Amino acid sequence: MDRYCVFGNPIGHSKSPLIHRLFAEQTGQVLTYEARLAPLDDFIGDARAFFAEGLGANVTVPFKEEAFRLADELSERARRAGAVNTLKKLEGGRLLGDNTDGAGLTRDLQDNAGFALTGKRILVLGAGGAVRGVLEPFLAQKPAVLVIANRTVAKAEQLVREFADLGPLVAAGFDWLDAPVDLIVNGTSASLGGELPPIAPSLIQPGHTLCYDMMYGKEPTAFNRWAFDQGAARCLDGLGMLVEQAAEAFELWRGVRPNTAPVLAELRRQLAG
């Protein structure tokens, strides 16, 4: 049977096996998909062992940069991201590395939330790997401007230098900004600790600005609770991004696009339970 997996460490919390099982059932694809705890000091060895038989894998924290180095070929979006979250075995055993994170977020915003990015003023908080992965897909939608705000401004400036050829990018500190924007994406991990990036409430235009946290949980994240209190039009979490990036990977492997809506609904139901 065709084998797939997700590599991570830790990995017990992963929803990927459930997501891909539901995708496979829905599309009539016959495959297995497992969560695989890779050793912190030998991801590449474990990945090579899996790909002796396996056909594809997702890669999560902390192995995305190592997967980038493992890949024999890279998609343009993976090359830009400097990280790989999806591997596919090609003819002859070569590995293609892709990054579906940014495409997943873009699709969640545009298809599921009905929010077009074209012509919008976008603020992205953070300058780490999660943000790097979304810049190419976001800029492909031709926003009016995309501002990267970070505590260490030099990191944001580095991303601007790397991606400036793709569209209008600006670097800023968290406290440099006060004019309202159309979309704020929290790409920091602050919500994991119940904390907030130190940004001005005036960035949110009540009833207009959409706020999106890449993190998700049973309860609204700290960032989304704050955004709601400031009058944000909508506050979305990263569960839709998780399901949509998985669908991108599934389509890359199997050549068929699953319907994400029932899968996202099932995950929401389980999360609430």
From Swiss-Prot:
Q: Please name the gene that encodes this protein.
A: aroE
* Key word Zinc present: no
Q: Write out the catalysed reaction.
A: shikimate + NADP(+) = 3-dehydroshikimate + NADPH + H(+)
Bilayer-crossing residues are none
Going by the UniProt record, its keywords in alphabetical order are: Amino-acid biosynthesis, Aromatic amino acid biosynthesis, NADP, Oxidoreductase
Q: Which InterPro entries match?
A: Aminoacid_DH-like_N_sf (IPR046346), NAD(P)-bd_dom_sf (IPR036291), SDH_C (IPR041121), Shikimate_DH (IPR011342), Shikimate_DH-bd_N (IPR013708), Shikimate_DH_fam (IPR022893), Shikm_DH/Glu-tRNA_Rdtase (IPR006151)
The enzyme's E.C. designation: 1.1.1.25
**EC top class named in words:** oxidoreductase
The entry's protein name is Shikimate dehydrogenase (NADP(+))
- Which top-rank group of organisms is this from? Bacteria
Record-level GO cellular component terms:
cytosol
Pathway given in the UniProt record: Metabolic intermediate biosynthesis; chorismate biosynthesis; chorismate from D-erythrose 4-phosphate and phosphoenolpyruvate: step 4/7
The residues that hold NADP(+) are 76, 126-130, 150-155, 214, 238
Q: Where is the active site?
A: 64 (proton acceptor)
Organism, per UniProt? Answer: Ectopseudomonas mendocina (strain ymp)
